[in-house]
Amino acid sequence: MQNDQQRFSLQNRTVLAHPYKRLGGAFTVKSPSVPNFHDKMHSDHSSSDSALVNGSFRANDHRSVEPSCLGQASPSEHDGNLSVIDLYGDEVESQRAEGEDDDDNNGDNGNEDLEEVHSDDLDLVPDDDNRQRVELEGAASATSANSNGINNTHFDRYGFKKQNNYISEAEYDKWWVEYSQYCVRRKHKWQLLLEKSGLPVTDDSPSRFPSKSERLKRYVRKGIPAEWRGNAWWHFARGQEKLNKNKGVYSQLLRKMKQIKKQNPNEKQVQDLDIIERDLNRTFPDNIHFQSSLHNKEGPPIIKSLRRVLVAFSLYNPKIGYCQSMNFLAGLLLLFLDEERAFWMLVIITSRYLPGVHNINLEGVNIDQGVLMLCVKEYIPEVWSYIKPSIDHHQKNNKTFSPSNKKVLFNMQKNEFLYRLPPITLCTASWFMSCFVGVVPIETTLRIWDCLFYEESHFLFKVSLAVLKLSEHDLSKIKPRNNSLNYSWGSNLNQRGGSMGQEDSDMEIFQVIQTFPKTLLNPNEIFEKIIFKRRFNLNRLDQDEIDRCRKFVAAQRLKFKTYGELLGNSTSEADLPINDNTDNKGIHITSDAVNEALSSEVYGFKKSLAGVHWNNSIKEKVKQMRKKKDKGD
């Protein structure tokens, strides 16, 4: 066979493919963007585990999978032990129409209205000498998978089902035809970027990436090649730095797990072990790699790894232990990283990117929801107008304040939504706890993770605002009930009627916010319509702003809780009776004291003044101005 050609069989068809030149007819190839699965699990694994893991190859591995390694499966069963290469039929049409323009405006971005166009970032069609060598892989492994009862056409390149309640398989396939070509072009640009940076790609698995820059951020936002994601996430999150400081820790945790099991096999020694076991089979049940076989009661290798990672984390950080949603974080990490690195990435996510979010009291997630509501109010007031009526309604019907305390009531209501969170946060809280896993389709989730690890946690707030902004059209379709979206407190609506009307509206808003993100199949929709648009103020949001805002919200919530307890109502945060001369257990607090405490802080977002980030107190700023004036005199 000639060196410049490859021959492979596609369902009894023999195809000759030139690696450089465009073919005259359509041909089927594997997408070059398949996850770079690890070659092995942790070194402490049993030999049986290792044998099963041999089915997980790298994207450029041409070895076939022996049926004996895969086990026997019934025609209706999906074997979770197969690798991604073996399972998917994410086959793409590599041929494009002659003369098709392939730059950012018509290719990557697909939107001529984009405000950021960079000449060094255009997806130009490479000539024969510089053309990306698209790896043409045979369908032998796919045929082997089919013989074991797996229909590849129903699953995406990560092993997830294409179809769900909001997206049909036909819609997915239609989108994938174009998006797969986008992935090919973006990977080629990444390769050129690394080569220009003196970081040549070897074995299609780069472990080093360029220093942070605006250009690299743009590349990350347009998507990291899927088979590079594990290494890229690890690099940007400084995972190796964390591992170097904790060498041998994960192995020690695994040995501790074994010792506990040997000493007390029937006694629960590990925190939340029962909950972890229960959630293992609830983790990505529709994903091929997580599905159990009738002949393997212990579950597929990735489930065993997931168990070890979650139990090890519970031992490593007993203050958090195990929190539901962590199984999805660890599960997705295991699709792209080996077991030990997945463990440390979970540690990094819970400590650096989402501090306190997974703590037992979940105060961290409440703080972040307060921050998100502040951001919605500031950056997308048009969406805030749908949330505010619920807050106003609650304040209007709150009978715990006496008429003599109107000033106290007014000052508390200014920041009330920070500690009495709006109903919508029951939905958006899961966005943060799971980092959008299960909230948006998998390709969009992975794009968000790319940006999260590169840009830090503020991107979660930014993309949340973008999703809410995109949902505005659906929110506008909600019909006001009893004038609930535009409350007029001078109306003659009775309390019950107004309450029911607002509750109905809250429910409809909740449904929109819960279901709309699940339709965002194309991640570029978020980026092209919102993130890359300079005219949206939400794109000014940065990590410094989020860090400051978190401190502000945490202080406000703590202050409210403290005064609630002092006033003898610590059992119910929702009702805080404040009356003049309240005497509780010898503590004498006047409404003026409460008013001073709860109204002293006001948050201000960065505007055009770079030196003014936020205001702790209007009075404090006045004092500072007076001091400066006195010094000047």
Swiss-Prot record:
Biased region (Basic and acidic residues) positions are 37-47
Q: Where is this region: Disordered?
A: 26-127
Listed name of the protein: GTPase-activating protein GYP3
Instruction: State any single GO MF term.
Output: GTPase activator activity
The role this protein plays is: Regulates exocytosis by functioning as a GAP for SEC4. Stimulates specifically the GTPase activity of YPT6. Also required for efficient polarization of the actin patches.
- Name any GO cellular component annotation: plasma membrane
* Alphabetical list of Pfam families matching this protein: RabGAP-TBC
Q: Which UniProt keywords apply?
A: Cytoplasm, GTPase activation, Phosphoprotein
What range(s) does the Rab-GAP TBC domain occupy?
A: 223-456
Where is it mostly found?
cytoplasm
Query: What InterPro entries is this protein classified in?
Result: Rab-GAP-TBC_dom, Rab-GAP_TBC_sf, Rab_GAP_TBC_domain
Gene from which this protein is expressed = MSB3
The intrachain disulfides are: none
User: What residues bear Phosphoserine in this entry?
Assistant: S147, S484
Q: Where is the composition biased (Acidic residues)?
A: 99-115
Localization recorded for this chain is:
Cytoplasm; Bud; Bud neck
